[in-house]
């Protein structure tokens, strides 16, 4: 039995201590506590159904079956040569103030302009904060940063990598040309192409300007003075002679608390089809347990996922498998490493 196995493995010193082994009698545990234990458990092994190897086999089969559900269209990815005109907001330096190789103030001094690309990046992260009394967001020149509600440290809506030389975004807009299969990110991170990434910082707003695949892109980000909401307005203009069919995928890494790792498995995601809204709540956050975030879009969501492992697959944030699939799996994030991704 379990107690004998613990004794034989000389692990008795780990009994009933944090991070150790707890032997509990099911008959002495309330139904509510048992449900809680099963909810937060990373793995459940039932001896009535066989040994550990049998349980692991069931988990593996379930995992493989889940990832076979949606066909993968990752056949030949075509990258067309980029010969379109580039956008450079620092081109007319005579009209700018305090110009340097990275940026300058606009002629009226009300905006600060930054230009970056893969070969010319800022020596450190430039952060810009837009906030009201309850809600705020921080964005960087690479479109990194995070969002918070009520408390910027204890109640982060999305993840934050506070590193001066690494700018890993937790809120990303991916764009895919459905015909050429070319994919890029609207910000410099995490999937840059060879074009310039221009940023305009103003009082209470930020604009990201980019041109790729003959598509002019502008994203304006701001937080209203009173409302607890982050608004992003995306404008696309096709400069090609032919029509373009694009897929736009929005990705975010929800935390809804202080620690990203502690939130894993406890983010409950729900999709309201009638209102075109995805809601999420951290069931393990006692201080802000009643807070619910929502993500919506002016266009109808085609599919979504709350499963970070499904979205990344064998790839990563710079090359997620989810962008190669015809649709996402429409699954919740509960019990998994969470994300909110939709197209």
Q: What is each of the regions a protein language model found here?
A:
Residues 1-343:
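Anionic coordination/interaction segments
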């Amino acid at each position: 039995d379990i107690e004998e196995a613990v004794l034989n493995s000389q692990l008795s010193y780990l009994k009933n201590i944090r991070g150790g082994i707890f032997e509990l009698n099911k008959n002495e545990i309330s139904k509510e506590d048992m449900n809680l234990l099963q909810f937060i458990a990373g793995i459940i092994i039932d001896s009535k159904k066989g040994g550990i190897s049998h349980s692991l086999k069931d988990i593996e089969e379930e995992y493989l079956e889940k990832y076979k559900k949606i066909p993968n269209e990752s056949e030949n990815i075509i990258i067309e040569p980029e010969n379109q005109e580039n956008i450079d907001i620092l081109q007319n330096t005579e009209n700018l103030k305090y110009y340097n190789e990275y940026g300058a103030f606009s002629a009226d001094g009300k905006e600060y302009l930054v230009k970056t690309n893969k070969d010319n990046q800022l020596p450190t992260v430039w952060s810009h904060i837009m906030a009201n009394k309850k809600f705020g967001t921080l964005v960087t020149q690479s479109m990194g940063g995070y969002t918070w509600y009520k408390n910027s440290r204890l109640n982060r809506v999305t993840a934050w990598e506070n590193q001066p030389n690494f700018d890993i975004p937790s809120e990303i807009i991916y764009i895919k040309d459905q015909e050429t299969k070319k994919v890029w990110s609207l910000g410099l991170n995490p999937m840059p192409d060879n074009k310039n990434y221009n940023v305009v910082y103003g009082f209470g707003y930020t604009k990201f300007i980019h041109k790729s695949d003959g598509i002019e892109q502008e994203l304006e980000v701001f937080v209203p003075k009173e409302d607890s909401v982050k608004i992003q307005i995306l404008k696309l203009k096709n400069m090609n002679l032919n029509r373009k069919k694009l897929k736009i995928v929005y990705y975010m890494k929800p935390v809804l608390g202080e620690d990203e790792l502690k939130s894993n498995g406890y983010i409950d995601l729900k999709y309201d089809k009638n209102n075109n809204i995805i809601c999420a709540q951290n069931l393990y956050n006692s201080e802000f347990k009643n807070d619910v975030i929502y993500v919506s879009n002016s266009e109808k969501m085609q599919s979504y996922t709350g499963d970070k492992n499904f979205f990344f697959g064998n790839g990563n944030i710079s090359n997620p498998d989810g962008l190669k699939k015809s649709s996402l799996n429409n699954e919740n994030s509960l019990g998994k490493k969470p994300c909110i991704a939709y197209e």
